[in-house]
Swiss-Prot record:
The keyword Transmembrane helix applies. The gene is cyoE. It comes from Shewanella pealeana (strain ATCC 700345 / ANG-SQ1). This is Protoheme IX farnesyltransferase. Keywords: Cell inner membrane, Cell membrane, Heme biosynthesis, Membrane, Transferase, Transmembrane, Transmembrane helix. NCBIfam families: cyoE_ctaB, PRK04375.1-2. One of its GO terms (biological process) is heme O biosynthetic process. It comes from the Bacteria.
Length: 301
């Protein structure tokens, strides 16, 4: 186990401590996730989303997502300290003790669950709890270290937010919400595999069997390209069932074409930094795609 690091007094101040807790929630990841939750809520109703499910749902789901991220930090603290991308995280640096981190993650998740159960509905509370377990336990603690298909199988937990938003408003499952889940499920592998190519040596160093480590970079590039094509097809499903109109169709087509082009470049060109470019583009792809869903919905209601 890594030795606890002695920190300057400024780094043990309450303000610095709260910044460390905030960092443990992976705020940028949660923000993108909450965008997909919001879109799920808005697409579930023809008009304005009711205020209580909107506020309580976003708060509760966000808190439980932050809790899952904090548990991820806890479980991965050893390997995080050995990887250049993550060695500055609060736990490897000793900015937060393990006991405090466990308490923080547990309290945050519990409060989020209570908010969802009491103010939204039990279905959303339990689905969000299942997503937390899927990400923090099934993926982080087991799949990540067990199989190169970790991100494919474990990606289902990360694809749930639009469904959570939908059930928060309606209290029931709907096929249209599952189409949004399919989109994120197909988006997840090329997103993470691009990062895994860029960080291949680091994953190999800590014995994490990411696809580039176990099957090679070229095979992973091929998989990324094939998954971007699969994603492009998945992005058309909302149009095919009449859920979306021309604004989304044009937007998703352009975004899919851009993602496929980036993946093609990655596969057939050896330009340095292309894998990281694909990773960054994938983030904008998902963000803009869900914004297009939102705009299209309110233009064509």
């Amino acid at each position: 186990m890594a030795k606890q690091i002695a920190l300057p007094r400024s780094q043990t101040s309450p303000l610095f401590q709260w910044r460390a807790y905030y960092e443990m929630t992976k705020p940028k990841v949660v923000a993108l996730m909450l965008l997909t939750v919001l879109v799920g809520m808005c697409l579930a109703v023809p008009g304005t989303v009711p205020l209580v499910p909107l506020i309580a749902g976003m708060a509760g789901i966000g808190m439980m997502a932050g809790s899952a991220a904090a548990f991820n930090h806890l479980i991965d603290r050893r390997i995080d300290g050995l990887m250049a991308r993550t060695y500055n995280r609060p736990l490897p640096k000793g900015r937060i003790s393990i006991i405090k981190a466990i308490s923080f993650a547990s309290i945050l998740g519990t409060l989020g669950f209570i908010i969802l159960y009491a103010l939204v509905n039990p279905l959303t509370a339990w689905l969000t709890f299942a997503s937390l377990i899927g990400y923090a336990v099934v993926y982080t603690a087991y799949l990540k270290r067990a199989t190169p298909q970790n991100i494919v199988v474990g990606g289902l937990a990360g694809a749930m937010p639009p469904l959570l938003g939908w059930t928060a408003v309606t209290g029931e499952f709907h096929g249209n919400a599952l189409l949004l889940v399919i989109i994120i499920f197909a988006w997840t592998p090329p997103h993470f595999w691009a990062l895994a190519i860029h960080r291949k040596a680091e994953y190999a160093k800590v014995d994490i069997p990411m696809l580039p480590v176990t099957h090679g970079v070229e095979f992973t590039k091929t998989c990324i390209f094939l998954y971007t094509v699969l994603l492009a097809i998945a992005c058309l499903l909302p149009v095919l069932v009449g859920m979306c109109g021309p604004v989304y169709l044009v937007s998703s087509t352009l975004l899919s074409a851009g993602f496929i082009y980036k993946a093609w470049q990655l596969k057939f060109h050896e330009t340095p930094g292309l894998a990281m470019n694909v990773f960054k583009f994938s983030i904008y792809h998902l963000m803009l795609l869900f914004i297009a869903l939102l705009v299209d919905h309110y233009l064509w209601v």
